C-alpha cells in the first residue's frame, strides 16, 4: 500500500473539495489514461487495487503510471468510545482527487487492451471516470 515515508504532522484537517483540478489533468507519460469526473477521497487500497487490475490484464506488455499519491491521513476513533478526549489515531491514507485529475496512465499497448484494462481499474474506483487518449 502507498503511504508517505514521513510527514511533518501526524494528523490533518479534513478540508473540502471545491472546484476542479488544475494540476495533473493532462497526460504526461503514457498514451491512454483514466480521468476522474467527480471529487472524492481515494484510499491507498483502492489505488493499489486499480493498479493490480491493470497490470494483471495487460500482463507483461506496456507500462503503467500511477499519477496520484495518498498523502492525507484519515483518523478513526475506536468503536464504542465516548466523545471528547482528542482526535482519533491515523488509520489509513487517502489522495484528494478533484474532477479532471488523471489517476492512471498507460502506454506501450494497443488501444483495445488499454481501454479494457482501464475499464477494469475504473470499476475499482469510488467515482465516475472517463478513458482519455493523448493528443
Curated annotation (Swiss-Prot):
Single GO molecular function: structural constituent of ribosome
Main location: plastid
InterPro entries in alphabetical order: Ribosomal_uL16, Ribosomal_uL16_bact-type, Ribosomal_uL16_CS, Ribosomal_uL16_dom, Ribosomal_uL16_sf
GO CC field: chloroplast; mitochondrial large ribosomal subunit
Keyword Glycosyltransferase tagged: no
One of the protein's GO biological processes: mitochondrial translation
ATP-binding recorded as keyword: no
Cellular localization per UniProt: Plastid, Chloroplast
CDD domains tied to this protein: Ribosomal_L16_L10e (cd01433)
One Pfam family it belongs to: Ribosomal_L16
Keywords: Chloroplast, Plastid, Ribonucleoprotein, Ribosomal protein
NCBIfam families: rplP_bact
Family to which the UniProt record says this protein belongs: Belongs to the universal ribosomal protein uL16 family.
Record PANTHER family: 50S/60S RIBOSOMAL PROTEIN L16 (PTHR12220), LARGE RIBOSOMAL SUBUNIT PROTEIN UL16M (PTHR12220:SF13)
Assembly mode: Part of the 50S ribosomal subunit.
UniProt protein name: Large ribosomal subunit protein uL16c
UniProt source species: Drimys granadensis
Phylogenetic classification of the source organism: Eukaryota, Viridiplantae, Streptophyta, Embryophyta, Tracheophyta
Gene name linked to the record: rpl16
Amino acid at each position: 500500500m502507498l503511504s508517505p515515508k514521513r510527514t511533518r504532522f501526524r494528523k490533518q484537517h479534513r478540508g473540502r473539495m471545491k472546484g476542479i483540478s488544475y494540476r495533473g489533468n493532462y497526460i504526461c507519460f503514457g498514451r491512454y489514461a483514466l480521468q476522474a469526473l467527480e471529487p472524492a477521497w481515494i484510499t491507498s487500497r483502492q489505488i493499489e487495487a486499480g493498479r493490480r487490475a491493470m497490470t494483471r490484464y495487460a500482463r507483461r506488455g506496456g507500462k503503467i503510471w500511477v499519477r496520484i499519491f495518498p498523502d492525507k491521513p484519515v483518523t478513526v476513533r475506536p468503536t464504542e468510545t465516548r466523545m471528547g478526549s482528542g482526535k482519533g489515531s491515523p488509520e489509513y491514507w487517502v489522495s484528494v482527487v478533484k474532477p479532471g485529475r488523471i489517476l492512471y496512465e498507460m502506454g506501450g499497448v494497443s488501444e483495445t487492451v488499454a481501454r479494457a484494462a482501464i475499464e477494469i481499474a475504473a470499476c475499482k474506483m469510488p467515482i465516475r471516470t472517463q478513458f482519455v487518449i493523448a493528443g
